[in-house]
Each structure stands twice: as C-alpha cells, then as structure tokens.
C-alpha cells in the first residue's frame, strides 16, 4: 500500500509546483492568497464498523436467550405481519430494479440539480489532483481518468505506470467488472511466472471473447497489461498482446500492487459560502439538493436490510447502548449534510460535509475561515438550543445534524478589539442571503 501513497504524494507535490508558477524572492514581500475551498474527509468507513458491531451484539444476545421459552402466539403474529410488510417492500425494490432504477444510477446526476441558491451543488476533490481541483463527481472521475492515462503514456518510471493503471482499475469501474478483470489479469501473469518457457502463455488474442468481456471492457485493464510488458502485434488479420519483456521478475511486484490496489481517495468539497444577514434577518432551513436524498439501487437494498434488522430489534430486549446504535443507523440514508454556522457581525457561513465526518471537522472548517486576529481565539459551537457537543469525535449523523443544521459560534472573549471576523481571502465571497434561503 505504501507504493500507492508514494505515488499520490509525488503527484500531489508535482501538481502543487505546476500551479505555483514562477518562484518569488523572499525579500520581495509577495505572497499568494489561500483558496476558499475546503475538502472533507473520506467517507464510508464507519457504517461497516457500526453494522458489524451491531450484528455481533445481536448474535451474543441470541446465545444468551437459548434456554428461554418459545415465543407466545401474540409475538409470532407480530412477526408474521412484519415479515409480510417486508416482503411487500422487497417486491417494490425488485420492481424498481426492473423498471425504474436507471435514473438513480446515473453517474453524473450532480449535473442536473435544481435547487435554491443556498446550495449550488455537491462538488468533490481528490488527493491525486489536489484540493483546489473541484468538480462534480462525473467530471472529477473523467479528469482522474485523463490524468492517469497521461501518466501511463508519459511516465519514465515503469512502476509509476503500473500504479497508475491499478488506480484506474480501482477508481473508475464498478465492483463486479473490476474484480473479474483483476482475476483474469492475475491469471495471465501467473501463467507466465509458472510457465516461463512456454510462449503460448505470453500471447493474448485481442479478439478473444473472454478478453473482450473481462479485460478490454474495463477501464485500466489493457493499460495494466501494457504497463507490465505486453505489446500489441499482428499476425495476419489477428492482433495479439504479446509479453515482450526479457525478464518476468517484475510481475511479482506488479501482481502484489494489483491485488492490494486502492481507489483514488475522493472527498466532498466544502464549497464554502459566506452570507451577510440583514438586521433582524433569520436564516431559514435551506432547500437541499437531490443528492442529499437520492438513493441508488444498492442503497435501497441496504435500506431493506436495515428494515429487517429493525423488526428483529423490536422483538428482542435491547440494552441502552444497542438502542443508541439503532438511532444512529437511521441517519445513514443521508450522504451529505449542509452545516450553517452563525458568526458575530451578522455573518453566516456554510459548508458541505459527509454525514460520517466527525464534528471536529466542523470546528476545523470554522477556524480555517477566521481572520488572523481570531485564529487562536477559543470558541464553542452550539446548536439552536445552545447545547454543546461533548464528544467531537462523534459523526454528524450520530449527532442528528443531517441533512442540514444551523450552529452558532460563541467566542470565549470579547471581540470588540479584533475587528474583522473572517480572513482577508474570504471577504470577496461574502454575499447577501436571499429571503428564500
């Protein structure tokens, strides 16, 4: 995995210096302004851990109940009703899969959002292209594809070409086609390693149906083969990929990279906006984008499984900790949350967060927008009821701050001597908050 981190870090540094332009003498007094876009933490890791812990707790509880008497008739009747309702919902999900889920599976649905000016749209950034490269998800994935393709064709380091191809495979394909391609490519390379003297294992006919369906149709599949030493050659009307390297030792390391591959980390961009409120104006709950609610087919199935687990929970004795986890799971259907923070001076800032980011990410976000004079000032974040968050490691979903929330900044000291609230680089983006927002 270190090879992927090294590759990402190297390309991030290269991108940084490309965008920095010409050097500036330290004595010249010139400096570059900081951008106003902020990126969120990568999402998703907490769901699996919570779900796994919950299932383990249920299994342990069932073992404790082995010797309890059988359920009475009333309890069995409740189970029958619940199961019948779940079957009806399952049929509805299946109907969606057959007739109407294509609209939910559009990879570029971020491009068709219709909502108020409170949220322009959900945007993303990546570790590979840098936090300042902010796009819709579809556009960002296309940019990642183009960047990695350039690396494969232009890189002098053979290992960089392999890593770039692996990143393409893991970042730009769905799970099943990706796994099928990786399995097939591994077989090609393993055959060469296991049978070094047999030329038949070093040649792949491009017209072969299995190759076309399993490898050629997957983004990065052929690129990986070419990166490890396969070259296109013609024999009559047929075309082949032929392994032409004199040595196959490098295939061992390439296979390890392929099996242990990872996707380019993509994060939701903060999309910072700052509003100036009129005297007495109160911000309303914003209208949210479709992305905050739309669920894919896989997410619908996950919701179905959650409902089945809920029925099981209703029919078993739950500890306080188990009930708290149940409440947390109900928020996982939201992908993002819009956090608005009220600042002194009738200012209102807002940013987009992943629901599974910790509350501490909001504190970092607020601190990063404050002026130099306030950058070291102590402050607290309170909700509408003036309640403090005690555990800032808790996720925004766990704190019921999804799909939108309004917080207030309270400074520990008097601000009369500090003047400007937000940093200079953010002054120009301040705008009036429309009444509808």
Swiss-Prot record:
Region annotation (Disordered) ranges: 1-45, 89-109
Q: Where is the composition biased (Basic residues)?
A: 7-18
Which tissues is this chain's protein expressed in?
Expressed in the pharynx and some head neurons.
Q: Which residues form the PUB domain?
A: 179-251
InterPro entries with a match to the protein in the record: PUB-like_dom_sf (IPR036339), PUB_domain (IPR018997), Ubiquitin-like_domsf (IPR029071), UBX_dom (IPR001012), UBXN6_PUB (IPR042774)
The UniProt record describes its induction as:
Up-regulated in response to starvation (at protein level).
Domain (UBX): give its ranges: 332-409
- PROSITE patterns, per the entry: UBX
SMART domains in the record: PUG (SM00580)
Q: What GO cellular component term, any one, is given?
A: cytoplasm
KO phenotype (gene knockout): Reduced lifespan. Prolonged expression of the lysosomal protein glo-1 12 hours after starvation.
* Subunit-structure text: Interacts with cdc-48.1 (via N-terminus) and cdc-48.2 (via N-terminus).
What role does it play? Probably acts as an adapter for ATPase cdc-48.1 and/or cdc-48.2, conferring substrate specificity. Involved in the lysosomal clearance of cellular material in diet restricted conditions.
Q: What is this protein called?
A: UBX domain-containing protein 6
| Gene behind this protein | ubxn-6
């Amino acid at each position: 995995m270190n090879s992927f981190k090294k590759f990402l870090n190297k390309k991030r540094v290269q991108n940084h210096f490309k965008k920095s332009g010409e050097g500036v003498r330290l004595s010249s007094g010139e400096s570059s302004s900081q951008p106003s876009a902020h990126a969120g933490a990568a999402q998703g890791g907490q769901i699996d851990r919570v779900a796994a812990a919950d299932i383990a707790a249920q299994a342990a509880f069932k073992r404790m109940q082995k010797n309890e008497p059988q359920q009475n008739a009333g309890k069995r009747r409740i189970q029958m009703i619940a199961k019948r309702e779940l079957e009806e919902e399952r049929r509805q999900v299946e109907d969606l899969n057959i007739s109407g889920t294509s609209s939910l599976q559009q990879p570029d649905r971020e491009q068709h959002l219709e909502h108020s000016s409170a949220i322009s749209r959900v945007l993303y950034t990546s570790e590979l292209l840098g936090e300042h490269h902010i796009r819709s998800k579809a556009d960002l994935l296309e940019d990642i594809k183009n960047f990695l393709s350039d690396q494969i064709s232009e890189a002098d380091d053979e290992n960089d070409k392999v890593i770039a191809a692996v990143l393409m495979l893991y970042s730009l394909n769905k799970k099943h086609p990706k796994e099928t391609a990786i399995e097939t490519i591994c077989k090609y390379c393993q055959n060469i390693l296991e049978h070094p003297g047999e030329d038949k294992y070093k040649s792949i006919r491009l017209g072969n149906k299995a190759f076309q369906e399993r490898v050629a149709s997957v983004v990065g599949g052929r690129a990986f083969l070419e990166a490890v030493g396969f070259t296109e050659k013609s024999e009559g009307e047929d075309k082949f990929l032929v392994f032409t390297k004199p040595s196959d030792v490098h295939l061992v390391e390439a296979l390890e990279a392929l099996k242990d591959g990872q996707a380019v980390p993509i994060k939701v961009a903060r999309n910072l906006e700052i509003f100036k409120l009129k005297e007495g104006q109160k911000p309303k709950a914003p209208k949210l984008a479709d992305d905050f609610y739309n669920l894919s087919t896989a997410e619908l199935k996950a919701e179905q499984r959650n409902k089945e687990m809920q029925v099981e929970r209703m029919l078993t004795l739950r500890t306080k900790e188990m009930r708290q986890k149940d409440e947390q799971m109900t928020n996982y259907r939201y992908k993002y949350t819009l956090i608005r923070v009220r600042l002194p001076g009738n200012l209102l800032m807002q940013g987009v967060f992943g629901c599974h980011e910790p509350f501490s990410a909001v504190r970092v976000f607020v601190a990063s927008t404050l002026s130099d004079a306030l950058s070291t000032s102590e402050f607290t974040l309170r909700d509408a009821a003036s309640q403090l968050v005690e555990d800032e490691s808790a996720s925004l979903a766990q704190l019921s701050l999804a799909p939108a929330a309004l917080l207030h900044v309270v400074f520990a000291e008097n601000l009369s001597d500090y003047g400007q609230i937000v940093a200079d680089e953010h002054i120009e983006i301040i705008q009036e908050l429309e009444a509808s927002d």
